[in-house]
Curated annotation (Swiss-Prot):
GO cellular component, one term: cytosol
Function, in words: Involved in the gluconeogenesis. Catalyzes the conversion of oxaloacetate (OAA) to phosphoenolpyruvate (PEP) through direct phosphoryl transfer between the nucleoside triphosphate and OAA.
Protein residues bound to Mn(2+): 185, 204, 241
Residues annotated for substrate binding in this entry: 45, 179, 185, 305
Identification of the protein by name: Phosphoenolpyruvate carboxykinase (ATP)
Primary enzyme class: lyase
Encoding gene, per UniProt annotation: pckA
Entry GO MF terms: ATP binding; metal ion binding; phosphoenolpyruvate carboxykinase (ATP) activity
Any Gene Ontology biological process: gluconeogenesis
Keyword ATP-binding: yes
InterPro entries registered for this protein in UniProt: PEP_carboxykinase_ATP, PEP_carboxykinase_C, PEP_carboxykinase_N, PEPCK_ATP_CS
Family (UniProt): Belongs to the phosphoenolpyruvate carboxykinase (ATP) family.
Length: 513
């Protein structure tokens, strides 16, 4: 930071930040006590504006391309100094936080923000430690200045806004954007780069634990059900989005949740509903004339959000971590209506589907996405956040599955009986019944039937689920049309997978066109 900053609020409380945000006109107080803020034109992540500084220490280990775009060190330093100078005479908010609920693998991070509500977001989503940085590790710095306007020709950015990660300097710079999710995803990308070198698998997943200490992981892209399904009244939540899987443990990388709010209902998502109260930040949620949030209103964006600390969840795992997972669930939202609601995977199939990351962009978190739903392949169920080559993460996944003996399942939260627009989407109670059968261990030894084209093993019965739903061909009125769509999907899988250099055992574990 630049010298001479005045009016610094250091480690401010929730009440202080809410009060300051309201006083400064950054947001409104809602009827349920939450603070609602609007993010302007950017209502999602801006992947085209995200860069990693290209420097000797990390250059060889990063997969450079459209996701990880290089930025020159000298250009970064110049821009960092310009943003620091911009903040030097402003009221700013600073907190000492941590990323990673593990004494060995945490990162200390000092977060400086121009907005009070951004600081509240950071304190909700990162971990507020009892004693900051007990191991005395080098501290990371996040500097977030949404009011700063970048000049692409001068600064080397792609637009007026940017997100830049610098591993050598341990710095993250955010300038020109109000969407707060960029802060959490930046530090997730940092841990995604650092953890594999320590033999820890970083994961874009949610996690919960049962009364008997059995951990379950839920992988999936935004909108596939990670947050909803892990917020289970019968289990204890570890976290809803980012975790590390180390030998002996699964730990949360964060200290809070960032839940999608579109169509949120008390009936279907009681845990999330109850977590939205004083201290929660609502992003781009529209209020009615009595300031009651209208969760059905997508006039600002489909990507409406609630950011709250884990303390807002009654049934949570206090220490923010658990044992290794007995069950691992890959959530896919299949818009073609071809995939079964649940399949059991071998470890090779798990690696195949992990690398494929087949799903749909549902109410996408990325800028420029509309409500239209389209299928996508997102490596490791989170391609935008993984700096290393995909094979690094797939190998670590197979190693952890093999060493611990986890059972992996592919669960379709998308369509059946026809593609999007024709068939119907699996309802949340059906998916919950499937997940209940998975976490109870009932599906581990159940009889299965083989689906040839998809190369998947499907249970013949699942408690609480209509048997007719289990084999997808039975839900289509036109069986020939189903085979046609299944063939098309198998071909898409194969075309996407051709880019991976992996053993034949993994290559052959996917659909057969």
């Amino acid at each position: 930071m630049a010298e001479g900053i005045n009016r610094v609020h250091r480690n401010p409380s929730t009440a202080e930040l809410v009060e300051l945000a309201l006083r400064r006109g950054e947001g409104e107080l809602t009827a349920n006590g939450a603070l609602v803020a609007k993010t302007g034109a950017r209502t999602g992540r801006s992947p085209n504006d995200r860069f990693i500084v290209k420097e000797a220490g990390s250059e060889a280990d990063i997969e450079w391309g459209n996701v990880n775009k290089p930025f020159a060190p000298e250009a970064f330093n110049a821009l960092w100094d310009r943003v620091a100078a911009y903040l030097a005479d402003k009221e700013v908010f600073v907190s000492d936080l941590e990323v990673g609920a593990d004494p060995e693998h945490y990162l200390p991070v000092t977060v400086t923000t121009e907005y009070a509500w951004h600081q509240l977001f950071a304190r909700n989503l990162f971990i507020i430690p009892e004693h900051f940085n007990q191991a005395g590790k080098p501290t990371w710095q996040i500097m977030n200045a949404p009011g700063f306007v970048c000049e692409p020709e001068r600064d080397g950015t792609a637009s007026e806004a940017t997100v830049i990660i610098n591993f050598a300097e341990r710095k993250v710079l955010l300038a020109g954007l109000k969407y707060a999710g960029e802060m959490k995803k930046s530090m997730f990308s940092v841990q995604n780069f650092l953890l594999p070198a320590k033999g820890v698998l970083p994961m874009h997943c949610s996690a919960n634990v049962g009364k008997d200490g059995d951990t379950t992981l839920f992988f999936g892209l935004s909108g596939t059900g990670k947050t909803t399904l892990s917020a289970d009244p019968k289990r204890f939540l570890i976290g809803d989005d980012e975790h590390g899987w180390a030998p002996g443990s699964v730990f949360n990388i964060e200290g809070g949740c960032y839940a999608k709010c579109i169509d949120l209902s008390q009936k279907n998502e009681p845990v999330i509903w109850d977590a939205i109260r004083f201290g929660t930040v609502l992003e781009n949620v529209v209020l009615d004339d009595k300031r009651v949030p209208d969760y059905k209103n997508a006039s600002l964006t489909e990507n409406t959000r609630a950011a709250y600390p884990l303390e807002h969840i009654a049934q949570r795992q206090e220490e923010n971590r658990g044992g290794e997972p007995r069950a691992v669930v890959f959530l896919t939202c299949d818009v073609s209506g071809v995939l079964p609601p649940v399949s059991k995977l071998t470890k090779e199939q798990a690696a195949y589907h992990f690398l494929s990351g087949y799903t749909a962009k549902v109410g996408s978190t990325e800028m420029g996405s509309t409500a239209a739903i389209q299928s996508t392949f997102s490596t490791c169920f989170g391609a935008p956040f993984f700096p290393r080559p995909a094979g690094v993460y797939a190998e670590l996944l197979m190693k952890r599955i093999e060493e611990f003996g986890s059972q992996v399942y592919l669960v379709n939260t998308g369509w059946t009986g026809g593609p999007y627009g024709v068939g119907k989407r699996f309802d949340i109670p059906t998916t919950r019944a499937i997940v209940d059968a998975i976490v109870s261990g009932e599906l581990a030894s159940v009889e299965t039937v083989h689906l040839e084209k998809l190369n998947l093993e499907v249970p013949v019965a699942v408690p609480g689920v209509e048997t007719a739903l289990l084999n997808p061909v039975n839900t289509w009125a036109d069986k020939a049309k189903y085979q046609e769509y299944a063939q098309k999907l198998a071909e898409e899988f194969q075309a996407n997978f051709a880019k991976y250099q992996v053993p034949d055992s993994i290559k052959n574990a996917g659909p057969k066109a």
